Regions:
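Hydrophobic small-molecule pocket/channel-lining residues, especially in calycin-type beta-barrels
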Residues: 1-132
Length: 132
């Protein structure tokens, strides 16, 4: 799942990182349950307590546990499910899900720079390539 410039490593083997190591987006461990990739993330960086990835803000602490499930439901669809558990700030686990659909054509890297002054030429080149 892409969100701006965030990059998260999901390790498929190993143990959780020591508590002294706090990656900005947490420590993600994944495993397969049949055809579903399950990712459990803990150990969020203390300054990463406010998320706005789904148009709503929610708080996270160093005790937060996020479980994500990625299941291919058809050739072009992926069911994304998540749950957030943190007894220090929430009275119960809360959940959400959405269907992610593949797009036609290439997916370009999300990269920008101050002013984005080159975007006009980048888009012009892409439109020319489409015409050819």
């Amino acid at each position: 799942v892409e969100m701006n410039h965030d990059v998260r490593t999901v390790r498929m083997v190993g143990k959780p990182l020591p508590k002294t190591v706090r990656p900005w987006l947490g420590d993600s461990l994944g495993h397969w349950e049949g055809d579903t990739l399950v990712v459990r993330t803990t150990g969020f960086h203390l300054q990463q307590n406010l998320r706005a990835a789904i148009k709503h803000q929610f708080y996270m602490t160093e005790d937060s546990v996020v479980e994500e499930r990625f299941t291919r439901t058809s050739k072009g669809e992926l069911l994304y499910q998540f749950s957030v558990t943190d007894e220090s700030i929430y009275t119960q686990t809360w959940r959400g899900e959405m269907t992610l659909r593949s797009s036609e054509g290439p997916i370009y890297e999300y990269a920008c720079h101050e002013g984005n002054y080159a975007i006009k030429n980048i888009l012009a080149g892409a439109r020319q390539e489409e015409k050819e």
